[in-house]
Amino acid sequence: MPVKKITKEEILLKSSDVFRVKGYHNTSMQDLAEASGLLKGSLYYHFPSKEMLMKDLLISIHKYLTDSIFPIANDESILPEERMEKLLKKMGKLLLEKEGGCLIGNTTLETVGVVPEFQEVLQAIMNDWTAALKTIFETRKNSELSFRLAQQTIMEFEGAVMFSKLYNDRQFLYDAFARTMVKLN
């Protein structure tokens, strides 16, 4: 049988679904190889360890967010309310459209203090998300308050995703979104 050609990006995409559902520690290289349609040895050719694969996945997610979602905060062609709505809806879609929870939140909870290689990129993601929201809040609030509101929004949003998944009810996320819009004004 011919060897299947697959790119690193495709492996990362398929692996994200496995990590999202099974978590970091409960996912094996065999699970990731099967999800990618590869033999385990072929997966090791691309990624020498599960840690390297996850770190590359987190870096890839960070790049996607900083290239495609966080820049919405700086789009002065639309009102701050529209920026906030657009940014949060895109994040909500990312977090709810697939089985499992928030890969960033889950990986943070599962690996902080255990797999230190991930902490820097996880912090960078949260810092950039905070900065994006702060930019929007600063259109109406002072810098210090905007920073606190941005962090509070992320904490509430992550909790709302968890409740939405647990109770199979997206209203938790809709309510968090509505409260954020009130905080903006």
Residue map of PLM features:
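Amphipathic alpha-helical segments used for helix-helix packing
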Residues: 82-83, 96-117
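Amphipathic alpha-helical packing segments from all-alpha helical-bundle domains
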Residues: 82, 86, 114-140
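A general structural signal for well-ordered alpha-helical segments in protein cores
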Residues: 29, 54, 84, 101-105, ...
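Hydrophobic alpha-helical connector segments
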Residues: 56, 70-98, 150-153
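Short, basic, alpha-helical segments at the C-terminal edge of helix-turn-helix-like DNA-binding modules
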Residues: 59-65
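Helix-turn-helix
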Residues: 6, 10, 14-52, 56
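C-terminal peripheral helix-coil segments that are non-catalytic and often amphipathic
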Residues: 94, 127, 131-139, 143, ...
